[in-house]
Amino acid sequence: MKLRKYTILTLFLFLFGALYLNGCASSRPEPATPYDGTDYIRESELLPYDLADYETIPTNPNGSLSVPTYITRLDDQYFIVDCYHNQVIYHDNLTDPLYLWKVMTNDLSMGHTIASDGNVYLIDDTENNRILIMEKMQNSSGEIVYVPTQEFTGIGNRPHYIIYDDYTDTFYAWSSQSGEMFLFRHTNDSTRMYLTKVLSIPELDGVYVRSFTILDDRIYFVSGNSNIIEADLYTFEVLNRYPVPDAIAGMIQLEKIQNYYYITVSTDLTGNQDFATLIRVKNLKDLAKGNYEDVYANFLGGGTPYSLTRIDDRYYLTEHRLPGHSIWSFRVENDEITDVEAVY
């Protein structure tokens, strides 16, 4: 009888353990299936265009950048969002002078970021509460051109940050002052974009939050109200709040690099840019105690660091307020910042 009880108990523990482990291993839903175009809030508004208007591509009229807010590489081209010049520019290398770059679009009012899935390019037109959609085409000379083909108007209050997440096959566009996230998708056989869902963090309505970061099945919102918020990516249920000191409350971006969270800070809680810096911390809980490392001296300091992006094995930091230093490049090896270079 005892042997039978032990056998049943052992079997129960084995099955419970297997279920528990399987549950933990599959806590995140499977990668998104292709979108079928049937379930959506609204579809994009189509923009008229004539390829004949793109026989000549304008070059960048500016010899310097004015508050560059984002740099990335999409396909074989580098793109810079030149925010205060109201344009996105592109080029095939980072060594040529800026006046050789070409203008992708200047139909923006203070755009901040650009994202692509290889088929469409989405840009947040911040002050117009608009998402601009562009597509890559060829003009009659066979030259690659970028053409505005669609748009979404009335997108929240100052959409400020947009990314494409391959796992969920979704573009996420954050409305920086309404606490809303707008999700966009398209079908495999068409570039027509659909607004498929709007999620929100109600406590961030009316709070200026500049960006977010997706890490697996979690999404992190940088501090706009003295807290970094961690939420479930799929439901936006708030899971954790990480208080931060007033001196670093006006954050811009959070990026996980090896064992540290790197965070760019624009202002303190009162909006004073004299507190602008770049910090890093291993555990977000340590921020409340002031246990973080200021690493801005690696980039001279004195400006306002903005966005962090990764291209191949290097990271890129944009900044402003420091003449002659708008974009930096660096590596991180064994948690050490190395090979720092001024790009533009």
Predicted regions, residues:
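Conserved beta-strand positions in repeat-built beta-propeller and related beta-rich domains
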Residues: 80-84, 123-127, 166, 172-177, ...
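Structural motif
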Residues: 87-90, 129-135, 178-185, 225-232, ...
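Beta-strand-rich domains and repeat architectures in extracellular enzymes and scaffolds
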Residues: 55-86
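Repeated scaffold domains used in trafficking and secretory/extracellular systems
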Residues: 66-70, 109-115, 156-164, 205-215, ...
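Loop/turn-rich, solvent-exposed surfaces of beta-rich toroidal or solenoidal domains
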Residues: 246-292, 306
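Surface loop/turn motifs at the tips and blade-to-blade linkers of beta-strand repeat domains
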Residues: 59-64, 102-107, 150-156, 198-205, ...
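A short helix->beta-strand "capping" segment at the edge of beta-propeller domains
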Residues: 31-66
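Blade-level signature of beta-propeller repeat domains, shared across WD40, Kelch, NHL, RCC1
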Residues: 302-344
